[in-house]
Curated annotation (Swiss-Prot):
PTM text: Contains mostly 4-hydroxyproline. Proline residues at the third position of the tripeptide repeating unit (G-X-Y) are hydroxylated in some or all of the chains. Contains 3-hydroxyproline at a few sites. This modification occurs on the first proline residue in the sequence motif Gly-Pro-Hyp, where Hyp is 4-hydroxyproline.
Protein name as catalogued: Collagen alpha-1(I) chain
Provenance organism: Acratocnus ye
Family from the record: Belongs to the fibrillar collagen family.
Low complexity biased stretches: 108-118, 132-150, 198-237, 352-378, 387-406, 465-474, 577-591, 604-631, 660-676, 723-735, 864-878, 910-943
């Protein structure tokens, strides 16, 4: 050494591995501050849809809805059983003399004439319609067909326009204290510093006596940061040190600064999860109003009733002109019909007859095939913000975001309390074993002497480990030392005990610039099933579904009240014989004419999609047969009404009641079916005579030829009932208790990255960003080809002008088309730049967006917090369309069946209406039908659990090298 200056020699070998030190004393616990303002919502992408939650509990019985509208006219019902013969009516008055009768019947065919010469070939074309054949016997009911396969899914509807941004929500109530989060993910290991120059190996000296500890020297000036060195080999892991005891609870700290309430950008729509389990069967709905009477069924024709008393013969009218006799022979031309006679006047209406017994219900019809699924509706406007949901189970952490640029250095904070002792660091490599020194007695620590004038010598060889000294008392916490250099990252320790929930700190300054977003990560693992959320508000009514296919024939409903007479329709063609109207005065018995041919069937209506088959209901018990009631007295004869216009071709209605209604008799057993009587002889219609006794009902004549189809008459007036107003919503139920925590799901396989989605609609203009820092002028790149013209975006607010750059003014270039956004370039191979001068601290910016959530540690999830308060009820949505008809309610013991509605006859004298019969037993419920078309989009549901983390994003560009930190405090002396 020259002039007393020691020259450092080469660095010696590393010493042996040191023993783990004793656990440090626990530091005092920090003060718990008041809870801070709620932070702004995150802006990360919405995760995939979580697994379906457990089936919810059955809701309370809803209020009885408004009676539904009458359904579509059902298919023709089966022909009922033959009714019992009616009682003999009273003799009617003698009818008046009738008008001229119709043409006489066609004469018998004469003998066959000689065979004629072959005629000329007639024009080609369709021949006349032949007469319908006799009705065959009804076939046995076939088995129900198998349920058809579900139709293909309908095409996806067009995406709706972007919704308007919702209003800023009100400040939410402070939620319950959530469970402590698990340990965060292990950070990226920092690069080790460059190795120092190796000193010269000096001779191993004898261990000297323990010197007095020197005084703490002044902090040296920060040195120049060296170039980053290569990473060294990872050393072996040291033993885990024991955890220190928890410190005392500190006082409450100062309240944190309020967080920003700016609303985050909406994330993309998550992937639709698997369908949830089928819910439990709902409550039986209120019974709807009876539907209109169905068309007549295809059953067999009933037998004739009992023959009535013959009426008095009327005065014979003049005989009508005889028709032309047909030409003899099969090939002869058909004779032309004679002229039609004048129709007779309408007779007086007779008394109302007794009501016949109802027929037994027929078999159910088959279920129709399912209709095609409708197109998806367009999304509706955003609904009101829902109530705050309960705290869900801790989700998986999201993907790590791109590294941002370093922020401005903040002011030096107030020294905090010392933290808990951290895990032991990595052990260094074992050095050469030094010579063992003599074990001296453990001396007591002396007072600190003054600092010596010499420089710090080279470290001597490590001596043998001495005896552990007595643990000293805890000293007063000193001032916070300057931050030392970052050490190597230790092994990940075991999760410690759950600490006290600390107050949220104040929002930090926002970074000067935000890095470019990383690439979309692959979908992560599926998170555990969350707890079932509270019952949401009532959703908007869905759109009216398509009309369902006619379901199975249900039990006949009760006979509704007689509606008001409809307006007179246009005179139509002659239709088939309707049901017998009120008996008029008996006229002279005329000869029955030929029955007209039945008209062609009307056009079939549009087939709706199949309705949902109901669950089979319980079969009711048969009712007791009652005794037959006595016939009531005849009512007074009404005045003769003017002949009304011929009505449209109506469905055969029920048999009209005869005579005024007496007390209702019990339903008797169906009688045996009678045989069809032969047709009566053909006679001329006489004028109506005076009213005679009421005759018994004669047998029906043979079926005539089908007549031309009648025209459809005008629709009848609406019923007298008023449209009811929708019922008010019931009171909101109390929030349910949180369910038990679900078990953790198995770890899913990471799926492959999905295809890139189509470009969405242009978003709404975002808020103006802060002016960015002035960056260095980049080198001019080559001009790329013009990209395709994109759709015009919405005009955003004008941004603040940035500072003017130092570049020279260039020549004006041509306006190029905007090119597509290029991929992020790789980091260039250039050397790191020289450290820049420390910048002046900038103003505190707004609070930055919440960072991505860290990975979940191995610790168990904490207990679920208490349920949050239920939010206020949302606005009442529009009235929904009529829902599907609920299950058929249980019927009473007895009930009459309603007949088929026939065309209105001439007005008779109104009889007294008897009370309705008791309800009969319920029929079996039909099978469930296929689902109807989807309804409108409901309100936004509660947010689902946080999805699994995506893959790690690309590493951001390296930021500029910061200024070197001050040197750290000297370490504790090694063992003697």
């Amino acid at each position: 050494s020259a002039g007393g200056i020691s020259v450092p020699g080469p660095m010696g070998p590393s010493g042996p591995r040191g023993l783990p030190g004793p656990p440090g004393a626990p530091g005092p616990q920090g003060f718990q501050g008041p809870p801070g303002e709620p932070g702004e919502p995150g802006s990360g992408p919405m995760g995939p849809r979580g697994p379906p939650g457990p089936p919810g509990k059955n809701g309370d019985d809803g209020e009885a809805g408004k009676p539904g509208r009458p359904g579509e006219r059902g298919p023709p019902g089966p022909q009922g059983a033959r009714g019992l013969p009616g009682t003999a009516g009273l003799p009617g008055m003698k009818g008046h003399r009738g008008f001229s009768g119709l043409d006489g019947a066609k004469g018998d065919a004469g003998p066959a004439g000689p065979k004629g010469a072959p005629g000329q070939m007639g024009p080609r074309g369709p021949g006349e319609r032949g007469r319908p054949g006799a009705s065959g016997p009804a076939g046995a009911r076939g088995n129900d067909g198998a349920t058809g396969a579900a139709g293909p899914p309908g095409p996806t509807g067009p995406a709706g326009p972007p919704g308007f941004p919702g209003a800023v929500g009100a400040k939410g109530e402070a939620g319950p204290q959530g469970a402590r989060g698990s340990e965060g993910p292990q950070g990226v290991r920092g690069e080790p510093g460059p190795p120092g120059p190796a000193g010269a190996a000096g001779p191993a000296g004898n261990p000297g006596a323990d010197g007095q500890p020197g005084a703490k020297g002044a902090n040296g000036a920060p040195g120049i940061a060296g170039a980053p060195g290569f990473p060294g080999a990872r050393g072996p892991s040291g033993p885990q040190g024991p955890s220190g005891p928890p410190g005392p609870k500190g006082n409450s700290g100062e309240p944190g600064a309020p967080g920003s309430k700016a609303k985050g950008e909406p994330g993309p729509t998550g992937i639709q999860g698997p369908p949830g389990p089928a819910g439990e069967e709902g409550k039986r709905g209120a019974r709807g109003e009876p539907g209109p009477t169905g068309l007549p069924g295809p059953g067999e024709r009933g037998g004739p009733g009992s023959r009535g008393f013959p009426g008095a013969d009327g005065v014979a009218g003049p005989k009508g002109p005889a028709g032309e006799r047909g030409s003899p022979g099969p090939a002869g031309p058909k004779g032309s019909p004679g002229e039609a006679g004048r129709p007779g006047e309408a007779g007086l209406p007779g008394a109302k007859g007794l009501t016949g017994s109802p027929g037994s219900p027929g078999p159910d019809g088959k279920t129709g095939p399912p209709g095609p699924a409708g197109q998806d509706g367009r999304p509706g406007p955003p609904g009101p913000p829902g109530a705050r949901g309960q705290a869900g189970v801790m989700g998986f952490p999201g993907p790590k975001g791109a590294a941002g640029e370093p922020g401005k250095a903040g002011e030096r904070g107030v020294p905090g309390p010392p933290g808990a002792v951290g895990p032991a660091g990595k052990d260094g490599e074992a050095g050469a074993q030094g010579p063992p020194g003599p074990a001296g007695p453990a001396g007591e620590r002396g007072e600190q002497g003054p600092a010596g004038p010499g420089f710090q010598g080279l470290p001597g060889p490590a001596g043998p480990p001495g005896e552990a000294g007595k643990p000293g008392e805890q000293g007063v916490p000193g001032d916070l030392g300057a931050p030392g250099p970052s050490g190597a990252r230790g092994e990940r320790g075991f999760p410690g005990e759950r600490g006290v929930q600390g107050p949220p700190g104040p929002a930090g300054p926002r970074g000067s610039s935000q890095g470019a977003p990383g690439l979309q990560g692959m979908p992560g693992e599926r998170g555990a099933a969350g707890l079932p959320g509270p019952k949401g508000d009532r959703g908007d009514a869905g759109p009216k579904g398509a009309d369902g296919a006619p379901g199975k024939d249900g039990v006949r409903g009760l006979t509704g009240p007689i509606g008001p007479p409809g307006p007179a329709g246009a005179p139509g063609d002659k239709g088939e014989s309707g049901p017998s109207g009120p008996a008029g005065p008996t006229g002279a018995r005329g000869a029955p004419g030929d029955r007209g041919e039945p008209g062609p069937p009307g056009p079939a209506g549009f087939a709706g999609p199949p309705g949902a088959d109901g669950q089979p209901g319980a079969k009711g018990e048969p009712g007791d047969a009652g005794a037959k009631g006595d016939a009531g007295p005849p009512g007074p004869a009404g005045p003769t009404g003017a002949p009304g216009p011929i009505g449209n071709l109506g469905a055969p209605g029920p048999k009209g009641a005869r005579g005024s209604a007496g007390p209702p008799g019990a339903t008797g057993f169906p009688g045996a079916a009678g045989r069809v009587g032969p047709p009566g002889p053909s006679g001329n219609a006489g004028p109506p005579g005076p009213p005679g006794p009421v005759g018994k009902e004669g047998g029906k004549g043979p079926r005539g030829e089908t007549g031309p189809a009648g025209e459809v008459g005008p629709p009848g007036p609406p019923g007298p009932g008023e449209k009811g107003s929708p019922g008010a919503d019931g009171p909101a139920g109390a929030p349910g208790t949180p369910g038990p925590q679900g078990i953790s799901g198995q770890r899913g396989v990471v799926g492959l990255p999905g295809q890139r989605g189509e470009r969405g609609f242009p978003g709404l203009p975002g808020p103006s960003g802060e002016p960015g820092k002035q960056g260095p002028s980049g080198s001019s790149g080559e001009r790329g080809p013009p990209g395709p013209m994109g759709p015009p975006g919405l005009a955003g607010p004008p941004g603040e002008s940035g500072r003017e750059g130092p570049g020279a003014e260039g020549s004006p270039g041509r306006d190029g088309s905007p090119g597509p956004k290029g991929d992020r370039g790789e980091t260039g191979p250039g050397p790191p730049g020289a450290p820049g001068a420390p910048g002046a601290p900038g103003p505190v910016g707004p609070a930055g967006k919440s960072g991505d959530r860290g990975e979940t540690g191995p610790g168990p999830a904490g207990p679920a917090g208490p349920a949050g308060a239920r939010g206020p009820a949302g606005p009442q949505g529009p009235r929904g369309d009529k829902g599907e008809t609920g299950e058929q309610g249980d019927r009473g013991i007895k009930r009459g069946f309603s007949g088929l509605q026939g065309p209105a006859g001439p007005p008779g004298s109104p009889g007294e209406q008897g009370p309705s019969g008791a309800s009969g037993p319920a029929g079996p419920r039909g099978p469930p039908g296929s689902a109807g078309s989807p309804g409108k989009d409901g309100l936004n549901g509660l947010p689902g659990p946080i999805g699994p983390p995506g893959p790690r994003g690309r590493t951001g560009d390296a930021g500029p090298v910061g200024p070197p930190g001050p040197p750290g405090p000297p370490g504790p002396p090694g063992p003697p």
